[in-house]
Regions:
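Histidine-centered metal-chelating micro-motifs
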Residues: 57-60, 96-108
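Glycine- and acidic-residue-biased ligand/ion/polar-headgroup-sensing regions
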Residues: 65-84
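Hydrophobic membrane-insertion alpha-helices, especially the h-region
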Residues: 7-17
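Ser/Thr/Pro/Gly-rich low-complexity linker/stalk segments immediately outside membranes or between
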Residues: 21-29
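Ligand-binding loop in jelly-roll beta-barrel domains
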Residues: 75, 102-123
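Short acidic-glycine-tyrosine-enriched beta hairpin
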Residues: 84-102
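A short glycine-rich, His/Asp/Glu-containing loop-to-beta-strand
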Residues: 34-61, 66-70, 120
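Positively charged n-region of N-terminal signal peptides that target proteins for export
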Residues: 1-4, 19
């Protein structure tokens, strides 16, 4: 039942975010600048799905995402710094699903558990 609810939430967020979709950026593509943490699991003309594993203590290099739906699969603590912004520490909880606007940032796992995320980028 929980998997069905997560799937329904993802589909609903995709529909809501669809009209605000943007092209996937190329110059700071996480698959190119952070291939050790970002893996492509699916891509078609509508979406690109990335699986992200960030081990404790790892800081990802500056990278960019287009509009996307993010699904957190594990609990972990992050320090996220948007380009030109101040660091923000956040506890990410397993099961959280959110829609995200385009961003250029770097992410540091400041906790003791691996961060596991699915990112559905809208094209």
């Amino acid at each position: 039942m929980k998997k069905i609810l997560i799937a329904v939430a993802i589909v609903a967020l995709l529909v809501v975010c669809w009209r605000w979709s943007a092209a996937i950026p190329q110059d700071l593509d996480p698959l190119k600048v952070a291939p050790d943490t970002h893996k492509l699991v699916f891509e078609n003309r509508f979406v690109r799905v990335l699986e992200v594993h960030v081990p404790p203590g790892k800081t990802e290099p500056l990278h960019q995402h287009g509009r996307r739906v993010v699904v957190y699969l594990s609990d972990f603590n992050t320090r996220v710094t948007d380009k030109g912004g101040q660091p923000v520490d956040t506890l990410r909880k397993a099961g959280l699903v959110r829609c995200s606007e385009p961003v250029i940032h770097h992410v540091e796992n400041i906790g003791k558990t691996e961060g596991h995320v699915i990112s559905v980028e809208l094209k």
